[in-house]
Amino acid sequence: MAKFTQHTGIVVPLDAANVDTDAIIPKQFLQKVTRTGFGQHLFNDWRFLDNAGQQPNPDFVLNQPRYRGASILLARENFGCGSSREHAPWALTDYGFHAVIAPSFADIFYGNSFNNQLLPITLSEEQINELFAMVAAQEGMTFTVDLERQQVVAGDKVYPFEIDSFRRHYMINGLDSIGLTLMHDEAISQYESRQPAFLN
C-alpha cells in the first residue's frame, strides 16, 4: 500500500451529521469485492438526480466547480455510522480522497479507514466550525494534512490532532495486515520451529 506522510489538497465541506455508510456507498453497488470502481458511486443518491447516475445534482457539493478535484473531506459528527461495510472507505479513496476531518467517527468506519490508507482526523467541534467557515470564505481552499507532525495546516492556522501510534506507524509505512505480519516473518518462523511437530 502507498505510504502516507503528508498530503495537501482541496477541501470539500459536507455539512451533514450522521452520514452513514449507505449514503457513502449505497447497497446496490456492493456486488464487487475488489477495492476499485466504487468512486463513481460515492454519495450516489446525493450526487445524482436519477437512479442511473447520469444526471448530476447541481446542489450537491461534489458537483460544484469550486470543489472539483477535492481530496480532503470536511464532515460533521458521527461520520461513517451504520453498517460495517468496508466498501465505504474504498469508495472514498477510489474517488480520490486521502483524508476525512470530522468531530467524531463511527468506530468500525474509523478502523476500516486506516486499513485502506484513508486518514480519519478528529478535531473539536469548535475547530471544525472554524474550518467550515474558512472553506466557505475561500474558493479552492487547501489544507495540508501532516501525519508525521500530527497536524492540519489551514491557511496560517495549525490544528494538532491525536492518533494512535500504532496506526500512525501503519499508515506512514504503507502497511496492511499482511505487510505487518511479514515484518515479523523471522520471529514467526522461530516460534513455529520451537513448537512440537504435531502442532505444525
From Swiss-Prot:
The record's catalysed reaction(s) read: (2R,3S)-3-isopropylmalate = (2S)-2-isopropylmalate
Question: Which of UniProt's keywords are assigned here?
Answer: Amino-acid biosynthesis, Branched-chain amino acid biosynthesis, Leucine biosynthesis, Lyase
Pathway(s) per entry: Amino-acid biosynthesis; L-leucine biosynthesis; L-leucine from 3-methyl-2-oxobutanoate: step 2/4
GO annotations of cellular component type: 3-isopropylmalate dehydratase complex
For biological process, the GO terms are: L-leucine biosynthetic process
| A Pfam family the protein falls into | Aconitase_C
CDD domains listed in its UniProt record? IPMI_Swivel
Catalytic activity, EC: 4.2.1.33
Protein name as catalogued: 3-isopropylmalate dehydratase small subunit
Q: What organism is recorded for this protein? A: Sodalis glossinidius (strain morsitans)
